[in-house]
Amino acid sequence: MSRSEKLTGEHLAPEPAEMARLVAGTHHNPHGILGAHEYDDHTVIRAFRPHAVEVVALVGKDRFSLQHLDSGLFAVALPFVDLIDYRLQVTYEGCEPHTVADAYRFLPTLGEVDLHLFAEGRHERLWEVLGAHPRSFTTADGVVSGVSFAVWAPNAKGVSLIGEFNGWNGHEAPMRVLGPSGVWELFWPDFPCDGLYKFRVHGADGVVTDRADPFAFGTEVPPQTASRVTSSDYTWGDDDWMAGRALRNPVNEAMSTYEVHLGSWRPGLSYRQLARELTDYIVDQGFTHVELLPVAEHPFAGSWGYQVTSYYAPTSRFGTPDDFRALVDALHQAGIGVIVDWVPAHFPKDAWALGRFDGTPLYEHSDPKRGEQLDWGTYVFDFGRPEVRNFLVANALYWLQEFHIDGLRVDAVASMLYLDYSRPEGGWTPNVHGGRENLEAVQFLQEMNATAHKVAPGIVTIAEESTPWSGVTRPTNIGGLGFSMKWNMGWMHDTLDYVSRDPVYRSYHHHEMTFSMLYAFSENYVLPLSHDEVVHGKGTLWGRMPGNNHVKAAGLRSLLAYQWAHPGKQLLFMGQEFGQRAEWSEQRGLDWFQLDENGFSNGIQRLVRDINDIYRCHPALWSLDTTPEGYSWIDANDSANNVLSFMRYGSDGSVLACVFNFAGAEHRDYRLGLPRAGRWREVLNTDATIYHGSGIGNLGGVDATDDPWHGRPASAVLVLPPTSALWLTPA
């Protein structure tokens, strides 16, 4: 019997086992059954359309009705080969016929090189391969537009595309797996350009789940969880900024950062509204950068963005991805750098997201002692798996390239570095050398940092890392992790402990303000007064200050001046720049009304504005932040008076003398050693009346004489206002 004879009548159907897998949604190659297949002098077209009442193949001007065989499978044998093109006309009960190209007529949209690079973990533009991508193909019957879908699920028994386009039916759009790659793929013609979709995954554990696309560029607004097909037609206007970025080294430049939670800065604003209002505010306040709490999509607003489910999608709460691009663009055109918080340490266990994606531990480590973060109830990425490492490294590059982000602040680095992080004895598995270091996480961080700085020169990567791990900001080629900077958590804790004490007791804790200089140049530091310090019952910076409102305001002003004068870059969480009194909550906006009700808030806000202006104009405050040449003590030991004083030096030869009186009383006739005689101008006095202070000071400057003091050749006699900071420069 010839092949053509077999393909008649009941022989149009595939083998029963093949048919059973197709109906069950567990066929690994539905394209091998569906679509057009040539057999000697016949061509068979099969279409799997459950719930359809009629399917017709349109070949040129000819119509061929497909026979319904079983369970929604339709087929017809055409009496010729070399079929060039065709369309399917599908009719559902109660609906008009609609004509579409056959999805199972198209070749794979991924190439062997892409799959090879992914398997090795080295595809630097992986987001262009996996996920959902609108495409067009030219065929004999015209251009076919649609969307190609690709998802990695190597252990799945089957994967189908579901969405609004098919009524979330898991049968009509089964996907094929591309060899040993574990990538399932399908091109679907006429898919809506902003259509919602998920993947129905038949897991290796026998459980069927509907999953959001790990590479989705867009999502439904939470709490809805579907992915959305998204493409960009945004035209950037920040060419000058991007060209300049490639030439910069942020470590040696001014960097004062305003940390923002977009949803509660001013509730109700979209990305494009923020592009106007937030940009104007940051420019007015003089910050050089803004750092956004995680903007990647997250279902639970109470996580502040730190439990991410869609790593490639800006949250849809405030608009589209192009709307987010507009926000970044506006900030760049105003001269503001943009940093985003990035969370590669862990991810939530939501059943529709990454966890046990194909019925096995896929993105997470298979050993529960390594694959779960007990404190947060989340999964930990398997940093040693090439495809997972590629998912994360490519994600970092995606934000830097596709959204022009200037920096990534990597969250919870300590939890990545240590296998025993927050684990009880016996609750962790040592590395191959018997140690507690997570060697795979170390290698991942090194690869991420090296690749990010190679692909996007001039960007900054910042580690939130609170342990003594050595070499966090050391280059990877000499064994470091390769971060540009790390948060100085020790400085933050010591400083806040000190300033929260009554001035009467501060002299006994003077070391808390001097200890940071013992290690200030061991890494490249950011000095954070972040969101973590104004939540969970910690109050606010204002609330930590002792005394009445006048004393609290003076304390906060002196703290901020100390932060900006200390070696390191600055980060300040929103609301603290005007002394917000209520603890922050993501559920409500900042207390902007304080600026209308009391002068203290206005004074603090103006101080921050002036400090930023002075900071940018004085390289002594930033150009040698990471070297001992940029700093020297004038007097570190005046604990009796609660006074600290030091010099800052710039790479241009500039100098700045900084004096801090943390006592509750003023000091008159306070002699300060200086490097040269002559007039020294008071560029900052935090007790000035313009900041709602008491107005005690030095009438704008002092005259230094050739009287040695503090081991220096000259000195000047100053008045130090209570709880204040003075900055002086040669006139």
From Swiss-Prot:
Its EC number is 2.4.1.18. It catalyses: Transfers a segment of a (1->4)-alpha-D-glucan chain to a primary hydroxy group in a similar glucan chain. The gene is glgB. Disruption phenotype: Disruption of glgB is lethal for the bacteria in vitro. Affects the production of both extracellular alpha-D-glucan and intracellular glycogen. Pathway: Glycan biosynthesis; glycogen biosynthesis; Capsule biogenesis; capsule polysaccharide biosynthesis. The active site is at D411, E464. PANTHER family: 1,4-ALPHA-GLUCAN-BRANCHING ENZYME. NCBIfam families: branching_enzym (TIGR01515), PRK05402.1 (NF003811), PRK12313.1 (NF008967). Belongs to the glycosyl hydrolase 13 family. GlgB subfamily. It comes from the Bacteria. GO terms for biological process: capsule polysaccharide biosynthetic process; glucan biosynthetic process; glycogen biosynthetic process. HAMAP family: GlgB. This is 1,4-alpha-glucan branching enzyme GlgB. It comes from Mycobacterium tuberculosis (strain ATCC 25618 / H37Rv).
